[in-house]
Amino acid sequence: MFIGRERELNALEKLYTSNRFEFAVIYGRRRVGKTALINQFLGGKKAIYFMGIESNAKQNLENFSKSIIEYSSGIETETSFLSFQAALEYVFKLAEKERLVLAIDEYPYVARSSKSLASTLQLLIDKYKDSSKLMLIL
């Protein structure tokens, strides 16, 4: 059961309805319901959900690639993007056509495994912020 968090859900919904690039960061102590909030918000929306793991960049990229490809093709596959930049750019381009949410849960794990991820995100946000309808949640 999902209780409380109406204020946070309303804030996310407001960003979602803008239909332009939006960026939200959900943070807080462990075990306070951040993942439940994200899952509740994503219900019924076109969304790619990826949960980072405490592992290496290769494993996180493989898992992220699976999430993206499963969303875009509906098929589970072992195919992987060659880099986080290629994977993220693909998502930004998908979102040029329609509103799409990308939620990267446990982002710190992914960022620790890939030192260039933050600067890659900044580069792509700068490149696509005016043309993409992506809502990015970290």
Label each residue range with its predicted role.
Residues 1-138:
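Phosphate-binding site recognition
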